[in-house]
């Protein structure tokens, strides 16, 4: 039995593994780009299959492709979407910057599989042609950016946004539950005036709510599809109705609000939609990193740290120190946030590059974009499940630190003035006195006045503020 078969493209014949559906151009890419281990993301491959499926349907409707071929292409695409042919897409991210080789990988696989479905064979005698049939009315220059947007929008809608909403809801519930717990505030890593634990967490909630708005604001641009622009945006070799119809078909089969891009030149020449959307993801990463850092600082200890909250103890934390437990969910979240920030730099560089009518950094851009979405979605799910839901206040420790804080003296500003209040705080700190003892020693107010004016629960504004 032959282990290879001969496939042919415009450069001539080349041997391809007999058991594989891919063809000549995929094989050339495999041989010419043996770079690292990063492969084209499966979600991008499936987005390419969705794009080819929609194109086959529209080409049939416009009488550009026979019903027999269109049906076979759609069936082959459905098999790809079902994961039956995942190992037929072996190409590296590091290939042509337009994604042409991955587009042809899909064209070849669908053409060979569709030919088999029609009773034919794979290879040069196939019944369905990768360029003339599967790629009809298309160019890699509009197919690949379309697949990028399809994969990105679906990932944001199905993976990231639900997890962001879940974490926001968890923290919102914690904010309400802890609304009456007065604690010391901290600015510049120094003691500050009081607030409630609920107010502190309400700030985290508001951050995530803003992040959601920023992400949702970016979605309409991501929903614009380049398909129909073909090589340089002019729509050469396409039917006048093709671009609109294929966007409508993709909207139907994905249940997502895809539309044809109003300007195909922008859609081909830039990655602006993904640059802007990833900027929102970077903002989310910054917020999550701040939240995770706050959580692990507030939970530091257990005896020699701040220790105002407790978080779940999920696993042993040290191979040498018995009983040690670490804030591992916070650490995982902060690490992946750093990766997302790094991805943003690469995406910005890629988006700013490319020349004239085509951006040629697309595989790198979509690889990093989809990685960021997955990291953030998985990270939020893990942090929520294994940390956030288990946050509990340590009321005794909170009260201890609150009562030891010199910054409660701020309540005296409006009664005795800033300078005298500062003198009280400095004397208390220097001599190891309580604020009350220092105030009475200086003779600036009576004990009754101090007890009436320095009341932490009255220094937090509305106890319900924020949430």
Curated annotation (Swiss-Prot):
The gene is fumC. One of its GO terms (biological process) is fumarate metabolic process. SUPFAM superfamilies: L-aspartase-like. Its EC number is 4.2.1.2. Homotetramer. One of its GO terms (cellular component) is cytoplasm. Pfam families: FumaraseC_C (PF10415), Lyase_1 (PF00206). There are 2 substrate-binding sites: the catalytic A site, and the non-catalytic B site that may play a role in the transfer of substrate or product between the active site and the solvent. Alternatively, the B site may bind allosteric effectors. The record marks 331 as: Important for catalytic activity. Substrate binds at residues 98-100, 126, 129-132, 139-141, 187, 319, 324-326. Its main location: cytoplasm. It catalyses: (S)-malate = fumarate + H2O. Belongs to the class-II fumarase/aspartase family. Fumarase subfamily. Keywords: Cytoplasm, Lyase, Tricarboxylic acid cycle. The active site is at residues 188, 318. Pathway: Carbohydrate metabolism; tricarboxylic acid cycle; (S)-malate from fumarate: step 1/1. It comes from the Bacteria. Involved in the TCA cycle. Catalyzes the stereospecific interconversion of fumarate to L-malate. InterPro entries: Fum_hydII (IPR005677), Fumarase/histidase_N (IPR024083), Fumarase_C_C (IPR018951), Fumarate_lyase_CS (IPR020557), Fumarate_lyase_fam (IPR000362), Fumarate_lyase_N (IPR022761), L-Aspartase-like (IPR008948). This is Fumarate hydratase class II. It is found in: Cytoplasm. One of its GO terms (molecular function) is fumarate hydratase activity. HAMAP family: FumaraseC (MF_00743).
